[in-house]
Amino acid sequence: MKRLILLSALLMFSLSYGQTPITDSNIAQAVEICLSTHPVTGMCSDSEYGAMPDWDVSSVTNMGNLFLNRNDFNADISAWDVSSVTDMSKMFRHNYAFNQPLGDWDVSSVTDMNRMFGNAGAFNQ
């Protein structure tokens, strides 16, 4: 019985201690904070947003310029749910290292991909 109570308490704590949700209003700041400490992998687990590959970006609609000029960035963000995104313009522009698979992304809502990979020389997926 004590073990069940302890497990229930741990579950409640872990559910209440979640990471800050990623939205249009904070995604640029979240990227800046994360990549200031982990510029290549985005594995900033200790940040309030958690590690970048694990972010829930399902409510984000604008990812335009998100990784613009991030020359070293090459995080695996293939699991992101980008189905709500409408703007991905210049998202990886002038990013010379990014080369991760994005083939499973649902980009059916995207209306602007202008220069999304402009001068992103390493991208070959």
Description of each model-found segment:
Residues 4-14:
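Sec-dependent N-terminal signal peptides
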